[in-house]
Structure formats: structure tokens, C-alpha cells
Swiss-Prot record:
It is found in: Host cytoplasm; Host nucleus. The keyword ATP-binding does not apply. One of its GO terms (molecular function) is DNA binding. Forms homodimers. Interacts with ubiquitin-protein ligase UBE3A/E6-AP; this interaction stimulates UBE3A ubiquitin activity. Interacts with host BAK1. This is Protein E6. Plays a major role in the induction and maintenance of cellular transformation. E6 associates with host UBE3A/E6-AP ubiquitin-protein ligase and modulates its activity. Protects host keratinocytes from apoptosis by mediating the degradation of host BAK1. May also inhibit host immune response. It comes from Human papillomavirus 4. It holds the Pfam family E6. A zinc finger (unnamed) spans 27-63, 100-136.
């Protein structure tokens, strides 16, 4: 909330005194109402709301998946083996922000360590590190 506007769903609910279960937000991409299940996933993925034209927007899961694919195809910078990530980023693995390349979920420490010890690849896309989360790696 650096500019006074809520950035997360919980900030939004607190600021406007609304229950999460009563939220009605539109998807920034497809303009459909984001259903409760997708809002819950949006929250769990630690994504930020978009404020545009005096309205707040979230993103549905399908558009998130398509957005991740679009960014992968258009903003790919490089890929490295996860074992080299700490050296390249000059940070410990627990301090590196890594999102899932497919669903954009923020990876937890177990998933990051799994990337490291399984000799998986990490991808730099739009200046942000990406790898596979535990759900999407199984679908690969």
C-alpha cells in the first residue's frame, strides 16, 4: 500500500471492510468476474491487485496461465541449472523470489530446494526467476 491503495486481497478486504467471500473483482485480461476459487488461488499465489481507471482487478487462473506462457514466449532472457542460481543471484536460495513458470505461484522453500537438488532448470523471464512448482512439474 505504498501509494495508499491496497495491493493484496487481504489489504483490499481490510481497507473496504468487505468479507473475502463477498468480493466481486473482474479479471484484468478477460473481463469476467473472478470466481471465489480463483480469488483464493490469486491470494495463495501472493499476487497483487491492479488499479486501473478507478477500478481494482484480479486475474482468473486461466488468464494467469496464458499470461505466464505469453511472458515465457516473449520475455525469456536465459536459463540456468538451479544449482548455479545462488551464485548468479548472489543470494541464498531462500531469499530468491521464484514464481512458477506455468501458474505464477510463489515457490516455497521446499520447492526451491527441490529445484536445486533435482538439478532442475530455472528461467529468467522479465527479470524474474521462474521454475516449476510442485503442482505444475507433475503436469510437465
Amino acid at each position: 500500500m505504498a501509494d495508499g491503495r491496497p495491493a493484496t486481497l487481504d489489504d483490499f478486504c481490510r481497507r473496504f471492510d468487505i468479507s473475502f467471500f463477498d468480493l466481486r473483482l473482474t479479471c484484468i485480461f478477460c473481463s469476467h468476474t473472478v470466481d471465489l476459487a480463483d480469488l483464493a488461488l490469486f491470494y495463495l499465489k501472493k499476487l497483487s491487485l491492479v488499479f486501473r481507471g478507478n477500478c481494482y482487478y484480479a486475474c482468473c487462473s486461466e488468464c494467469l496461465r496464458l499470461s505466464a506462457l505469453f511472458e515465457q514466449e516473449n520475455y525469456f532472457q536465459c536459463s540456468i541449472k538451479a544449482v548455479h542460481l545462488e551464485e548468479i543471484a548472489q543470494k541464498k536460495i531462500k531469499e530468491i523470489c521464484i514464481r512458477c513458470i506455468c501458474c505464477l505461484r510463489l515457490l516455497d522453500i521446499v520447492e526451491k530446494l527441490d529445484l536445486l537438488y533435482s538439478d532442475e532448470t530455472c528461467y529468467l523471464i522479465r527479470g524474474l526467476w521462474r521454475g516449476y512448482c510442485r503442482n505444475c512439474i507433475r503436469k510437465q
